[in-house]
Regions:
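N-terminal export and membrane-targeting signals
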Residues: 1-10
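C-terminal motif of bacterial Sec signal peptides marking the signal peptidase cleavage site
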Residues: 14-17
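N-terminal "mature-domain start" segment
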Residues: 19, 24-118
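Second-shell loop/turn segments in exported
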Residues: 50-52, 131-139, 220-224
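Extracytoplasmic/secreted envelope proteins and their assembly/folding machinery
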Residues: 53, 57-63, 67, 132-135, ...
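A small/polar (G/S/T-enriched), proline-flanked helix-loop surface module common
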Residues: 73, 77-194, 245-246
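A short, solvent-exposed beta-edge/loop patch
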Residues: 127-129, 171-235, 240
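Flexible helix-coil linker/hinge segments at domain or subdomain boundaries
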Residues: 239-247
Length: 247
């Protein structure tokens, strides 16, 4: 849902003619920092895995952890019982080149199979901003550490790629690094700039491992989110997972 949601917001931006950068001004991708070095997660990190997705979902961030103006968004598959987008849209023309880069921003559980439980939370804010979190809990910390590594391996191969949205419109993607205070047992940060028809969205992303659980927090908007605000959300997300009773 996350990638298709970004594409939908880009379409809305085009319709409303609200570009994040005026003609002649540098786009957000021109200021992307390089990805940081690979971070190794401890395979023996302490922490029992979640085995119930409902319990894991309850440990994700909620409106109280976000800036004022955000509200929950129902997941069409989990909350509304609708079929996956790939099944619902027979005329879907979306594609990614290279194909492996379609994994960028995909839920952790999709990027590394074998999770004992997985969950997602979605929120929408003002001016086309969104915040979402997904988490996957694995049987062992070693499994979680491998998932954390897999995400970084994909990112390293996908610093620049392209594709099309569901309507066949060209989309360009650029990935760069972002700094942030360490969170959990291991963490990384990066930015993804998605551009189509001259309009761009910036996704600030934090991926963290705590115990046997890996979580991904994404804040998307026409401009990068305030660093302090994102740091607070990241540590709130990791803290809730670390302190929640797994079951």
């Amino acid at each position: 849902m996350r990638v298709s949601a970004v594409a939908a917001v880009l379409t809305a931006l085009a319709v409303s003619a609200c570009s994040s950068a005026a003609d002649g001004e540098p786009g957000p991708d021109e200021f992307l920092a390089p990805l940081g070095p690979m971070v190794t997660a401890p395979p023996g990190a302490a922490g029992a895995p979640f085995t119930d997705s409902a319990v894991l979902r309850a440990a994700l961030i909620d409106v109280g952890d976000l800036p004022v103006g955000f509200s929950p968004v129902a997941d069409p598959e989990e909350d509304l019982g609708l079929p996956p987008a790939s099944e619902a849209a027979q005329s879907d023309q979306s594609s990614t080149d290279p194909a492996l880069c379609s994994a960028v921003l995909s839920p952790v559980a999709d990027q590394h199979p074998g999770a004992a439980a997985s969950a997602s939370a979605w929120f929408q804010g003002p001016n086309f901003t969104t915040v979402d979190q997904d988490a996957a809990s694995y049987p062992t910390a070693a499994d979680a550490a491998q998932a954390f590594t897999d995400i970084q391996t994909t990112l390293a191969q996908c610093t620049g790629y392209s594709g099309t949205d569901a309507d066949g419109v060209d989309v360009q993607y650029r990935v760069g690094g972002r700094d942030g205070r360490p969170a959990g047992d291991a963490s990384i940060g990066f930015q993804l700039v998605t551009t189509s028809d001259g309009f761009s969205l910036v996704s600030d992303v934090a991926v963290a491992m705590t115990g046997s659980t890996v979580t991904q927090l994404v804040a998307t908007g026409q401009e990068p989110i305030d660093e302090g605000v994102f740091e607070d959300m990241t540590h709130a997300a990791v803290g809730k997972l670390a302190s929640a009773p797994a079951s």
